[in-house]
Curated annotation (Swiss-Prot):
GTP binds at residues 37-44, 71, 97, 176-184, 234, 250. Residues 352-372 are annotated as: Disordered. GO terms for biological process: cytoskeleton-dependent cytokinesis; meiotic metaphase chromosome alignment; protein localization; regulation of exocytosis; spindle assembly involved in female meiosis. The gene is SEPTIN1. This is Septin-1. Septins polymerize into heterooligomeric protein complexes that form filaments, and can associate with cellular membranes, actin filaments and microtubules. GTPase activity is required for filament formation. Interacts with AURKB.
Amino acid sequence: MAGGVMDKEYVGFAALPNQLHRKSVKKGFDFTLMVAGESGLGKSTLINSLFLTNLYEDRQVPEASARLTQTLAIERRGVEIEEGGVKVKLTLVDTPGFGDSVDCSDCWLPVVKFIEEQFEQYLRDESGLNRKNIQDSRVHCCLYFISPFGRGLRPLDVAFLRAVHEKVNIIPVIGKADALMPQETQALKQKIRDQLKEEEIHIYQFPECDSDEDEDFKRQDAEMKESIPFAVVGSCEVVRDGGNRPVRGRRYSWGTVEVENPHHCDFLNLRRMLVQTHLQDLKEVTHDLLYEGYRARCLQSLARPGARDRASRSKLSRQSATEIPLPMLPLADTEKLIREKDEELRRMQEMLEKMQAQMQQSQAQGEQSDAL
């Protein structure tokens, strides 16, 4: 009897999270990660270690003479990773050649341009008619590698971070941290934190834990916050530790560095933050804060005083989002976009005419039935 009363009083809203979980797992997840920093800091090795895959098997390392005049290039690599029935489409954006030239003036401009181009493409797609299948190519996170051999951030590091800190979530990383003693690591971390504050460079901010979070999560969250900038070591090689256990790490004459040992480096904290706990928040900050900031700047540029008279601005304020002019496309892309929209409008018109014909036919059949 009590069970029957319980069933009658149960509506079923408690099952809503299960619906979202099934839908999310079926759809899969997209994540775009940018890696930047000078060559030789272990960026490729760390990425392969983080995701247990080889994204750089076809890479050719240029000779030292070729690096003298090397220019920065943007490379995009994609891989689908499945774990426990959950699929993640990972897109890695690499920046080979960054900081390798003798003259590094404005070498960060291609990176800024690439990030803004992804915002521009998303804004264009979002303002179009076909909004169901928008491909999100925006950069959700940038791992910026800092040399362990300097005394903090170099002028190039500061210039790059200033140029992108309002466009992407920055996570600073000290590469090849096994070159430092523990005391040196902590001193370098504090120096970098002080410089970031002094230069007013905004890096990714961890959201505050809810009061109802369990204590283990709060402890892990505090450890991750204290680890920034993450001092990491990457390796896909399996070696034997002092207890003859197989571990991923690096063997030296003075001992073994274990990649997944929290006493040796911050690799586990970085992977936990990047994948297990804050991946979705990185995407939300990208959309709700960084992209919206770009979108607002685009709209403000259209309504600057002097660009249009007051009447034009009044008219613009009444326009819908789909009517707002977007950044100019190349002519070929514009013609292609127009053809696609014309074809979509034609299909919608045909569907509407078909529905009207069916309604008229049903109405005629109803009138005939009434006459009989």
